[in-house]
């Protein structure tokens, strides 16, 4: 996934037998354009196990169906976002907006910043509140955007890890887990669906 020496940006790239990780990671997508695979009548899975799986819109087609006209937000799940400490409220608001964008019915954003706004003017349907006042019953919870790494953040993360709802761990939630064996143990013990979204530095921790 790295350009070496004099490199041009292709509009199309043909690769043989199977996709290569470098075409899909780091700088690869910016240089490859549209990618096609020529199998050469070779069944790649019979040769080597895959190193990973690419994420494509088709994977989510069943979950991102257009809403019926005769519906309302209460029928499409309650998403929670927990984060937004002082100076980082925007990170939690962006996550909340993303939850709306992918179809969540109601989105609650719990903010740690005591001076956080009461409304997001860009998406006033977001329900903003103090972090400790998020509803207990959520369809899914994302924790970490702008969370910070203080004691209060760690306490809230521990409670989230103990909850039964599906959980997305991002940003500072990953930083906290990376340095705390007790949080790591809670993460390993979870039975509900759990998704980690690290960038390379967070993954390295």
What are these regions (language model features)?
Residues 1-3, 203:
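Proline/glycine-rich low-complexity loops and linkers
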Residues 6-7:
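A conserved, positively charged/aromatic
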Residues 10-13, 18-171, 175-205:
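Small-residue (G/A/S/T)-rich helix-start motifs and N-terminal tracts that mark the onset
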């Amino acid at each position: 996934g790295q350009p070496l020496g004099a490199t041009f940006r292709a509009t199309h790239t043909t690769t043989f037998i199977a996709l290569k990780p470098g075409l899909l990671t780091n700088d690869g997508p910016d240089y490859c354009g549209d990618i096609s695979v020529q199998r050469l009548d070779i069944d790649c899975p019979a040769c080597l196990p895959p190193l990973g799986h690419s994420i494509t819109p088709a994977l989510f087609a069943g979950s991102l169906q257009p809403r019926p006209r005769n519906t309302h937000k209460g029928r499409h799940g309650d998403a929670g976002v927990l984060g937004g400490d002082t100076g980082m409220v925007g990170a939690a608001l962006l996550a909340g907006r993303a939850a709306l964008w992918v179809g969540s019915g109601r989105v609650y954003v719990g903010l740690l910043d005591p001076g956080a706004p009461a409304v997001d003017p860009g998406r006033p349907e977001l329900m903003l509140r103090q972090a400790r006042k998020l509803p207990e019953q959520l369809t899914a919870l994302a924790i970490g955007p702008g969370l910070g790494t203080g004691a209060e953040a760690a306490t809230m993360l521990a409670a989230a890890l103990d909850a039964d709802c599906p959980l997305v761990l991002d940003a500072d939630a990953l930083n906290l887990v990376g340095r705390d064996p007790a949080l790591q143990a809670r993460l390993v013990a979870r039975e509900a669906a759990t998704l980690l979204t690290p960038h390379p530095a967070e993954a390295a921790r």
